[in-house]
């Protein structure tokens, strides 16, 4: 049976759920798909059950595995690709590696428990990796006391304000993912209200459609008889079947012979789309996660760059001791993981909680440009987050 082609009828956004473990992120994600799937005869959304999201296959990301579930759904005005990361470690790794470039996020907070350590950590991480818009779902509101829920809402707004999200303006919607899954009309309506808030509060991002095509490689697959496929989110520009592209890091120039999103063929992919690209005549072992597929000649790989970096405090899960010149951590840039030497120049020491300027010399060439965000990792934890200010 031939596959149905992907038809772009609505603007596309990438969204994700975040929040403390057991506050109901996965249940709410399942409820969103169920409510939208049952909206009427014209619904294009398919219901995805809790178990299917919760048992999402592991995705290998440079030596670390991430459990991440991808679902898609449509509201009246938009098409969403939604990621749910069931475990806390999965969320941290995902945000740090940029495996999911989110245009906005739904922060799920239990009305019974309020803010927990992971709630605050997820908000901090979202801010660092450039998620500019958050909508709050106060979950389990069916079981909570109204006065207590009011207090939790106040707490959440204060937390968001502290991290630069303008907590007073952020939509906070009281929901019950569980009751919505059970079909309770009141709580089904609450999920619809949440989606309305996402539709109206999270703006359409600038997608850089006019810029040269660039896609950071997240995964590489082989389709028997057809060739090598790379998957990832298009960072900027557009790509069509037949376009010439180069794989930076593999020094290969080739042609895109196939294009799919969520298993549906498409003629053209644009910035923000999650896609699979079939590349002509490229051997499976020449391409790997961390490389970049781009319009030929549009990006020059480099090793040295200057950056502004925030060093996480011990309270945020970072180091308890300062960094000095000569420090050699792992740099997570787009989907690449590269060791690098740090030179702090005149600053000499960077204490946990400081924001500093540093020069970095990477162990190998990586496509770099001003404004690119990255994370610094050491011993399996994030110790810093920064932005490239100059490429040398």
Swiss-Prot record:
The processes (GO biological process) annotated in the record are: translational elongation
Protein EC: 3.6.5.3
Main localization of the protein described in the UniProt heading = cytoplasm
| Catalytic reaction annotation | GTP + H2O = GDP + phosphate + H(+)
Q: Where is this region: G5?
A: 176-178
Which positions fall inside the tr-type G domain?
10-206
Q: Which residues bind Mg(2+)?
A: 26
The UniProt annotation puts the region (G4) at 139-142
Q: Does the keyword GTP-binding apply?
A: yes
Q: Where does it live in the cell?
A: Cytoplasm
Keywords annotated in UniProt: Cytoplasm, Elongation factor, GTP-binding, Hydrolase, Magnesium, Metal-binding, Nucleotide-binding, Protein biosynthesis
Q: Which family does it belong to?
A: Belongs to the TRAFAC class translation factor GTPase superfamily. Classic translation factor GTPase family. EF-Tu/EF-1A subfamily.
Describe its assembly.
Monomer.
> What protein is this chain from?
Elongation factor Tu-3
Q: Which organism is it from?
A: Streptomyces coelicolor (strain ATCC BAA-471 / A3(2) / M145)
């Amino acid at each position: 049976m031939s596959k149905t082609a992907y038809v772009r009828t609505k603007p596309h956004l990438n969204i994700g759920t975040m929040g403390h473990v057991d506050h109901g992120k996965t249940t709410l994600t399942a409820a969103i798909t169920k409510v939208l799937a049952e909206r009427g005869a014209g619904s294009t959304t398919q219901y995805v059950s809790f178990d299917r999201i919760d048992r999402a296959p592991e995705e290998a990301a440079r030596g670390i595995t991430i459990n991440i579930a991808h679902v898609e759904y449509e509201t009246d005005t938009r098409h969403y690709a939604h990621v749910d990361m069931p475990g806390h470690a999965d969320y941290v790794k995902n945000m740090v590696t940029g495996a999911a470039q989110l245009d906005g996020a739904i922060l799920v907070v239990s009305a019974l428990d309020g803010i927990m350590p992971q709630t605050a950590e997820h908000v901090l991480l979202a801010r660092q990796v450039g998620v500019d818009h958050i909508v709050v779902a106060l979950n389990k509101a069916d079981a909570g006391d109204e006065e207590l829920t009011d207090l939790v809402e106040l707490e959440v707004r204060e937390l968001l304000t502290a991290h630069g999200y303008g907590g007073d303006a952020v939509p906070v919607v009281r929901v019950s993912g569980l009751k919505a899954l059970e079909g309770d009309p009141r709580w089904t309506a609450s999920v619809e209200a949440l989606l309305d808030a996402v539709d109206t509060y999270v703006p359409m991002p600038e997608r850089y459609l006019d810029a040269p095509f660039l896609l950071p490689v997240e995964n590489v697959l082989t389709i028997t008889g057809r060739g090598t496929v790379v998957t990832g989110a298009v960072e900027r520009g557009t790509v069509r079947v037949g376009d010439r592209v180069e794989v930076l890091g593999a020094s290969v120039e080739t042609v895109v012979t196939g294009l799919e999103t969520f298993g549906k063929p498409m003629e053209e992919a644009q910035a923000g789309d999650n896609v699979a690209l079939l590349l002509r005549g490229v051997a499976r072992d020449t391409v790997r996660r961390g490389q970049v597929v781009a319009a030929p000649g549009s990006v020059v790989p480099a090793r040295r760059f200057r950056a502004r970096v925030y060093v996480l405090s011990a309270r945020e899960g970072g180091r308890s001791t300062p960094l000095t010149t000569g420090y050699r951590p792992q740099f997570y840039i787009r989907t690449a993981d590269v060791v690098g030497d740090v030179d702090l120049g005149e600053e000499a020491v960077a204490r946990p909680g400081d924001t500093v300027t540093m020069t970095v010399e990477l162990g190998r060439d990586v496509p770099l440009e001003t404004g690119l965000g990255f994370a610094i990792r050491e011993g399996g934890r994030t110790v810093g987050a920064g932005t490239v200010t100059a490429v040398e």
